[in-house]
């Protein structure tokens, strides 16, 4: 089984990259791909860049050039669920855009034209994430809706808009729905497993800078364990 792992930023992929054996580096379309072996599995680790377009371009290249059997999206996210604290993990059951609006043409808020309203995570990968979680002491996770947009959510107005339109949202970030849409179009299963680096409020930028390393550590540990389980 070949597994694709996607993180937007260098800090979000470094821990996993350092665990790869027989690592080779490839540069395509402005993205960095690391191929190698992780916990016995063939892995392609993508550093896509930040935002929806960068993520979609990188994911499309990953899927076309390397043809993974599944995609795991790792990294950081802003917490919306009240039970989440810094370093906790979020596991996607579905992913939606929070900044898409073609409702004038009869689509749901957040639904891109000619696309499903939500991109549904693969149930086997969700169960694998929960199995990985069960093997780790003192790690808390919430599964649910993750919303994506090309904005760092740090104002009460933006937070209220997202809560009003997506009341079940547990976390927000800037790449997952674009990754999910690419996987949907290539018919490749995906799941998002990220860790909380900040809470979506006015203190978010300061929190993000301080706690990104903690989020990267938590999400990387989860993903590495998932790879081990998937390879069994």
From Swiss-Prot:
Give the InterPro entries listed for this entry. MTA_SAH_Nsdase, Nucleoside_phosphorylase_d, Nucleoside_phosphorylase_sf
Give a single Pfam family match. PNP_UDP_1
Per the record, the pathway is: Amino-acid biosynthesis; L-methionine biosynthesis via salvage pathway; S-methyl-5-thio-alpha-D-ribose 1-phosphate from S-methyl-5'-thioadenosine (hydrolase route): step 1/2
Entry keyword annotation includes Cytoplasm: no
Give a GO cellular-component term.
Answer: cytosol
What is this enzyme's catalytic activity, as reactions? S-adenosyl-L-homocysteine + H2O = S-(5-deoxy-D-ribos-5-yl)-L-homocysteine + adenine; S-methyl-5'-thioadenosine + H2O = 5-(methylsulfanyl)-D-ribose + adenine; 5'-deoxyadenosine + H2O = 5-deoxy-D-ribose + adenine
Amino-acid positions noted as binding substrate in the UniProt annotation, renumbered to this chain: 78, 153, 174-175
GO:BP terms for this protein?
L-methionine salvage from methylthioadenosine; L-methionine salvage from S-adenosylmethionine; nucleoside catabolic process
Q: Which keywords, in A-to-Z order, does the entry hold?
A: Amino-acid biosynthesis, Hydrolase, Methionine biosynthesis
The question of whether Transmembrane is a record keyword is answered with no
- Matching Gene3D superfamilies: Nucleoside phosphorylase domain (3.40.50.1580)
Q: Where is the active site?
A: 12 (proton acceptor), 198 (proton donor)
- State the EC number(s): 3.2.2.9
Picking any one GO molecular function of the record gives:
methylthioadenosine nucleosidase activity
Coiled coil spans: none
Family of the protein in this entry:
Belongs to the PNP/UDP phosphorylase family. MtnN subfamily.
* Function of the protein: Catalyzes the irreversible cleavage of the glycosidic bond in both 5'-methylthioadenosine (MTA) and S-adenosylhomocysteine (SAH/AdoHcy) to adenine and the corresponding thioribose, 5'-methylthioribose and S-ribosylhomocysteine, respectively. Also cleaves 5'-deoxyadenosine, a toxic by-product of radical S-adenosylmethionine (SAM) enzymes, into 5-deoxyribose and adenine.
Q: Which NCBIfam families match?
A: MTA_SAH-Nsdase, PRK05584.1
**Protein name as catalogued:** 5'-methylthioadenosine/S-adenosylhomocysteine nucleosidase
Its lineage opens with: Bacteria, Pseudomonadati, Pseudomonadota, Gammaproteobacteria, Vibrionales
């Amino acid at each position: 089984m070949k597994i694709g792992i996607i993180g937007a930023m260098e800090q979000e992929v470094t821990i996993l990259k350092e665990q790869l054996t027989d690592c080779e580096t490839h540069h395509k379309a402005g993205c960095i791909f690391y191929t190698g072996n992780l916990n016995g599995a063939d892995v392609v680790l993508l550093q896509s860049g930040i935002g929806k377009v960068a993520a979609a371009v990188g994911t499309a290249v990953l899927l076309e050039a390397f043809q993974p059997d599944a995609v795991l999206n790792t990294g950081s996210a802003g917490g919306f669920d009240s039970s989440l604290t810094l370093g906790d993990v979020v596991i996607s059951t579905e992913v939606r855009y929070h900044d898409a609006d073609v409702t004038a043409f009869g689509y749901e808020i957040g639904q891109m034209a000619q696309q499903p309203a939500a991109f549904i995570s693969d149930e086997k990968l969700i169960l694998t994430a929960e199995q990985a979680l069960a093997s780790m002491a003192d790690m808390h996770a919430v599964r649910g809706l993750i919303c994506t947009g090309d904005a760092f959510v740090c104002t009460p107005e933006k937070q209220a808009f997202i809560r009003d339109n997506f009341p079940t949202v547990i976390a927000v970030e800037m790449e997952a729905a674009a990754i999910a849409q690419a996987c949907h179009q290539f018919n490749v299963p995906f799941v998002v497993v990220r860790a909380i680096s900040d809470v979506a409020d006015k203190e978010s930028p300061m929190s993000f800078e301080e706690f990104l390393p903690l989020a990267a550590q938590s999400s990387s540990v989860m993903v590495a364990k998932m790879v081990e389980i998937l390879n069994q």
